Structures are given as structure tokens and as C-alpha cells.
Amino acid sequence: MFIESFKVESPNVKYTEGEIHSVYNYETTELVHESRNGTYQWIVKPKTVKYEFKTDTHVPKLGVMLVGWGGNNGSTLTGGVIANREGISWATKDKVQQANYFGSLTQASSIRVGSFNGEEIYAPFKSLLPMVNPDDVVFGGWDISNMNLADAMGRAKVLDIDLQKQLRPYMEHMVPLPGIYDPDFIAANQGSRANNVIKGTKKEQVQQIIKDMRDFKEQNKVDKVVVLWTANTERYSNVVVGLNDTAESLMASVERNEAEISPSTLYAIACVFENVPFINGSPQNTFVPGLIDLAIQRNSLIGGDDFKSGQTKMKSVLVDFLVGAGIKPTSIVSYNHLGNNDGMNLSAPQTFRSKEISKSNVVDDMVASNGILYEPGEHPDHIVVIKYVPYVGDSKRAMDEYTSEIFMGGKSTIVLHNTCEDSLLAAPIILDLVLLAELSTRIQLKAEGEGKFHSFHPVATILSYLTKAPLVPPGTPVVNALSKQRAMLENILRACVGLAPENNMILEYK
């Protein structure tokens, strides 16, 4: 059975006019390696820590500024939200299609809330806590191309023509602000687009981005702004002591106009100084150590890296299944080809390397979890190939071959072929990222013994379900297994309304 909404009644939760207060007993374990009777052994000690959560239930008017607004993702998301807001339908060769938010975790997935008369009861994910309605989001942003969003939508060739015609009047007046352009960080083939750029030194560019965000907030009368990078993949920045390894060195490098400070890092700096959440949707190392240091100092939310949309999402499910089943993946070969501007930019070796790193690290934690299958330092052969084929446009092809060792020296090979509209997968993920980033800024918590409430750590691991290479605070383990990431996100939101984690034991029927 599916219900649209619910309210929790419990001694552990209290609803007030503007807040939800909850108490949650976090059950975990502590491990110690100690000598007992002359022999060292591992001791596992269960422990319980009481947490209090406080969630602001006032849903703000939200503005979203996209870096690369005029690209395939930006124009597709903007058009999709308008179509949903206006209730637009359009003819395809198969049927009359209604606008929807399929592919969005927050808008189109469900959570189990319990059982009733022997039947499982589910509710929308978005019913857990008050969230911004995507129909109410105000979009803006920057792009190195001055093409308006209606023409950009046509250039992208993602949405059906009948839908594009209906959206054009809403999008013709939407023109991106000038963006930061540095040809050293992206493929040379992007130069022909760059007719809408911010001039000046890196310090002046940061100041302009700050001004743009303030103007956008004032002109659109929004309460909060979230910024997300959906522009070209950049090459990796060199991390150098004295250049970008600390907040102080990073800001000094901006003052000196150092060439190695990337455009994406400049946007992130501007956002941190304005306390505006910044999310990196591409694989480059935008968050150099100095930027992470700066965000922690100023307690400003950052999240990333790289949208987890198709092939990598499948990989994080399949490898988790194989290793969890005691099967040993020994070779993973992933091949992609696509024909959109993302593929064109990735045809340059230096930008492809960023994507290769992002895609290749996704199985590391799963491999490390099983010392029966893998010796220390052992890892599957893992190859990623991306090719640019203009004809296929936004319809990305992904082919994977997984070779594994099974019982008694046997071999198993799984081959997958996935064809998908790249931007139609990415757009709802962008939506989820900005909505969850905004929501997380309204949640505060404190552990037993802490004097006052505080926000989540500014490095937003809560967003990891949606990213290929989750950004985590220094010293924090990286989790890539998809089911664990979703459970983490759902269970944190459940704790905010006093609900226990979904552990799937269902003891009442055992």
C-alpha cells in the first residue's frame, strides 16, 4: 500500500510551529585490539550514543545557479522543471507524454514506513521531511556561451521537438551570465563556444561571482541560493605545498593570480565566502586541500564529485553484489561512447584523465571489505575507455565486461550494454543534489554530552549516493556501495523524525 504522507507520534519526536525535534539512539560498535592472556585479539564492543536532531521546517524560496547553465544538463533540467510546473504534455511517436520527475530520488522514489494488516506500507521519499518543491525553484547561472536557454535546448537535442516548441516562450529570455574561462583547464575544442567570459584577474573573477550571486538573490527575492557545477570537466589541478594546500596558501595564490587555480575552484571560493552551498558535478579535483580547509573554517557546505548517473551506478551495485556473494571480480572493463559536448570535451587526454580517475575508484571500498577474496593491495584490473562519436549525440552507450573467479577455479563473465540519454539521467540527479543540500542546511544535531546544536560537517557526505567519487572529510572512510549510500541518507532523515533505521529484520513475522 502507498500513502502520500504521515506524521510520527512518539516520545522521541516533538513537532513545534517551526521545527521538528527528535531524539535518536545511535547503535554502533567500537573495536579494540588488546592483549588478553598473552594473546592479542579483536574485541567488538556494542555502544549506544544518544543524538538530538533539530530540523527547521520553514521551506525557503530556493534559487539554483548552475555553472554551465546553457549546456545539455542545464537546459534539460530547466526545461524539465518548467514542463512540470506548467503541466505540459507533448506528443511522441508512441503516446502523449506527461511531464514527470522520474529518475529523481526525492521526487519519484519511496520509503517503507511500516506494515498494516500484514501489508507493507510505503510513502514518498520527500514525505520524510519538508523539502523545497522543485516546481518553485528559480534557475539562473553562468556559461561561457551567451546562447539563450531556448536555443541551448535546441542545440542539445535532448528533449522532443514538440516539447521544445512549448517550452521556448518560457526560456527565450533566459540568458546565462558570463562565466570564467581558462583554456588551459578544458579541451581546446571548447574555444569556439567561449563568447561570454569574465575578464580580469582571478581575484576579480571571484569578486564578480560573489556579485552575481548577490544580485541573483536580490532580483529574484529568493531566501537561499545553491550553486552547482555542471560545466565542462576540467583537467586535474596540481596540488602543491604553498600553492593550494591550505586555505591561506590558496587565497594567497588567488591574490598572486596563480595560473594553477582552476575556474571551478574559483567558483567554490566565492560560494564559501558567501556561505552558499557549492556542489561539483564533474570529476576534476575542484576541492583541493586548501578549498576544503577554507570550507571547514567557514562552515560552508561543499559536496561532490561527479554525477553518478548510469554506468558507474550499475557498477557500484553489481560489484557490491558480487563481493558480498563471495565472488571475486578480477577484471572490469568499461567502454563508453557518446556524442554530446561532454564527450567532445573528454576527447582531450587531460580532461579524460579526470573522468578516468572518478570512474575507476568506485569499487575500492567493496574490494577492501573482503580479505578472504583479496590479499592486501590486490585489486581487479579496471580499465575505463570513453570515445567521442558525434552521431549518437546525448544517447550514451556503455558496455561493461566483468570477469570473476568462482568456485574451484571457475570463471564467470557478465556483459552489460546500457543505452541512455545522458542528460535525462543527470538532470534529476542535479535536482536531488540541490534539494538535499538545501535541506541539510536546515538540520542541526548534537551528541550526548555536547553543549549545543551544530550543523552537519561542511563536507557533505550525505550527498554521496548521487556522486561517483564522494567527497568526505579528512580521515573519513569512502563508501561507494550504492545500497549503503542510500540507506545512510534515508536513515539520517528517518532519525530526524524519530524513526529507527530500516534494518529489514521484520522480526514480527519470524
Swiss-Prot record:
Tell me the first and last residues of the signal peptide.
none
Q: What does this protein do?
A: Key enzyme in myo-inositol biosynthesis pathway that catalyzes the conversion of glucose 6-phosphate to 1-myo-inositol 1-phosphate in a NAD-dependent manner.
Write down the required cofactor(s).
NAD(+)
Report a single Gene Ontology molecular function: inositol-3-phosphate synthase activity
GO CC, alphabetical: cytosol; nucleus
A GO BP entry is: inositol biosynthetic process
Q: Which residues bind NAD(+)?
A: 70-73, 143, 180, 190, 193, 230-233, 281-282, 306, 309, 340-342, 355, 393-394, 422-423
Task: Provide the catalytic activity annotation.
Answer: D-glucose 6-phosphate = 1D-myo-inositol 3-phosphate
Task: Please state the protein's primary subcellular location.
Answer: cytoplasm
What is the species listed in this Swiss-Prot or TrEMBL entry? Answer: Sesamum indicum
Please give the pathway this protein is involved in: Polyol metabolism; myo-inositol biosynthesis; myo-inositol from D-glucose 6-phosphate: step 1/2
Q: What is this protein called?
A: Inositol-3-phosphate synthase
Its domain of life? Eukaryota
Matching entries from InterPro entries are given as:
Myo-inos-1-P_Synthase, Myo-inos-1-P_Synthase_GAPDH, NAD(P)-bd_dom_sf
Checking Pfam families in the record gives: Inos-1-P_synth, NAD_binding_5
Q: What is its EC number?
A: 5.5.1.4
**Similarity field:** Belongs to the myo-inositol 1-phosphate synthase family.
Enzyme class, top EC level, equals isomerase
Subcellular location per UniProt equals: Cytoplasm, Cytosol; Nucleus
What keywords appear on the UniProt entry? Cytoplasm, Inositol biosynthesis, Isomerase, Lipid biosynthesis, Lipid metabolism, NAD, Nucleus, Phospholipid biosynthesis, Phospholipid metabolism
